[in-house]
Amino acid sequence: MVTLDKSKDLFDKARKILPGGVSSPVRAIKPYPFYTESANGCRIKDVDGNEYIDYCLAYGPNILGHANPVIKQAIIDQLDKGWLYGTPTGLEVTLGEKIASLYPSIDMLRFVSTGTEATMSALRAARGFTCKNKFVKIEGGFHGAHDAVLVKAGSGATTHGKPDSLGIPEDFTKNTLQVAYNDIEAMTEVIESNQDDMAAVIMEPVLGNIGPILPEGDYLKEVRKVTEENDVVLIFDEVITGFRLAMGGAQEYFGVTPDMTTLGKIVGGGLPIGVFGGKREILEMISPSGSVYQAGTFSGSPASVAAGIAAVDVLEKEKVHEKLEATGNMLRAGLNDIIADKRLDFHVGGIASMFKVFFGDKPLNYQDVLKCDKEGYLQFFHDMLDSNVFLPPSQFETNFLSTAHTEADLETTLEAYAVNLK
C-alpha cells in the first residue's frame, strides 16, 4: 500500500487557497490526491516517492509519453528564442498547413489556447455562418466548460437543456438541445423539428468523457447525412480523438467528414493549445476577415505550436498508430480474459489506444453509463493506486495508452487488474 503523507500535507495547504484544493475538478481524488514530483515515459512519481504506471497521461495529451525528448528539445529551442511575442509566427503556418493536410474537413483554422475555447468559438462561427441559434449536443458529450454546453443529460430522447452549474442563467442554454448517442431517430427528429433555427450539431465522434463509447454501425454516417440534408453545420469535437485514433482522427478512422473540427491535447505536444477549423466559407466569417469575433493573447503561443509541430512530426514519422492499436488490442484481450475467468458482469470498452472497464453492461449512451457501479469502481481505483497503477479516478473517464508503455508494463498492469477486479 502506498503512503501519501507529503501529499496530504500539501493538500491541507492547497485547500486553503485553491477551491477544493485543486485547479481542475477531475484531480480532486478522495480523500486527497497524490502530488506529482516528476514524470517520464509512462511513469509518474509523487512527492512521497511512489511511482505509478500512468494511464491518465494528463487526460489524453501525452500519447508519446511524459517528457518525450523530441518535444522537450523543440520547447527548449523555442524558449531560447522567446516564448510569447504578440505577433504572428511562421510556426503557426507550418502546423496549420500540416493539420489541414491531414483533416479534409479543414480548409482554414485558428489556433486558441484550450479545447474549451475551440468548441466555444466553433459554435459561435457556426451560428454566425448560418444566422441561426439552436444546436444539438449529445447527452454526456463533453465540450469544455463554457456556458452553452454545460447542460444536464435529459431522461427523454431530447430535452431543452438546463444548466449543469450554478451561475449559468437558463436563457444561456435554452437553445441547447440534447439527444442520446447512437440514436439516429432522435437526432433526425430534433433537427427536422427545429430546422428553421438549427445552426449546428456538435459531437464527440467517440464519447471520451463517459467512455470510451463507440458509434454503432453507420451512426456517424447517418448523422452526416441528416445534417447535410438540413443544412446544419456538423462539428466533430476531436479534442480527445484527434491524432489519437489516427493522424486524421476519428474522421479518418470512420471515414466521415464533418463541416468543422475542434482539436486540442495531442496537437500541442502537452502544452496548452486548441484549434478550430473547417470549410473556408465558415472560417472566413472569423474576425478580422468577417464579423464573428474571436481573439486571445496566448492564441498561437510559440512554445505550444513548436511542441505541436514536434509531436505531429514524431507521430507521422514513426507511424505510431498501428503499434498503439496492437497494444490496445493486447491489453483489452487480457482484460476480457480476466473478467471471463472471474465471471464478472463487466464490459471492456475501447478503441485504438483508448480503453475502459465498465462496471456493468456494455453502454451505448450516457444513460447506460449511469447504471454502472460507480462506488465499486472508486474502490477499484484506490486498490489499483495501491498496486502502483494510476487510472482515472472516475468511471466516466477514459484510460489512455502511449508509445512509452511496454509489453512488460502491460503485463504488470494486467496482474494488478487480476488482483483488484472483483
From Swiss-Prot:
<dbReference type="GO" id="GO:0008483">
    <property type="term" value="F:transaminase activity"/>
</dbReference>
<dbReference type="GO" id="GO:0005737">
    <property type="term" value="C:cytoplasm"/>
</dbReference>
<dbReference type="InterPro" id="IPR049704">
    <property type="entry name" value="Aminotrans_3_PPA_site"/>
</dbReference>
<comment type="similarity">
    <text>Belongs to the class-III pyridoxal-phosphate-dependent aminotransferase family. HemL subfamily.</text>
</comment>
<dbReference type="InterPro" id="IPR015421">
    <property type="entry name" value="PyrdxlP-dep_Trfase_major"/>
</dbReference>
<dbReference type="GO" id="GO:0006782">
    <property type="term" value="P:protoporphyrinogen IX biosynthetic process"/>
</dbReference>
<dbReference type="Pfam" id="PF00202">
    <property type="entry name" value="Aminotran_3"/>
</dbReference>
<dbReference type="InterPro" id="IPR015424">
    <property type="entry name" value="PyrdxlP-dep_Trfase"/>
</dbReference>
<keyword id="KW-0413">Isomerase</keyword>
<keyword id="KW-0963">Cytoplasm</keyword>
<dbReference type="GO" id="GO:0030170">
    <property type="term" value="F:pyridoxal phosphate binding"/>
</dbReference>
<keyword id="KW-0627">Porphyrin biosynthesis</keyword>
<dbReference type="InterPro" id="IPR005814">
    <property type="entry name" value="Aminotrans_3"/>
</dbReference>
<feature type="modified residue" description="N6-(pyridoxal phosphate)lysine">
    <location>
        <position position="265"/>
    </location>
</feature>
<dbReference type="GO" id="GO:0042286">
    <property type="term" value="F:glutamate-1-semialdehyde 2,1-aminomutase activity"/>
</dbReference>
<comment type="pathway">
    <text>Porphyrin-containing compound metabolism; protoporphyrin-IX biosynthesis; 5-aminolevulinate from L-glutamyl-tRNA(Glu): step 2/2.</text>
</comment>
<protein>
    <recommendedName>
        <fullName>Glutamate-1-semialdehyde 2,1-aminomutase</fullName>
        <ecNumber>5.4.3.8</ecNumber>
    </recommendedName>
</protein>
<dbReference type="InterPro" id="IPR015422">
    <property type="entry name" value="PyrdxlP-dep_Trfase_small"/>
</dbReference>
<keyword id="KW-0663">Pyridoxal phosphate</keyword>
<dbReference type="InterPro" id="IPR004639">
    <property type="entry name" value="4pyrrol_synth_GluAld_NH2Trfase"/>
</dbReference>
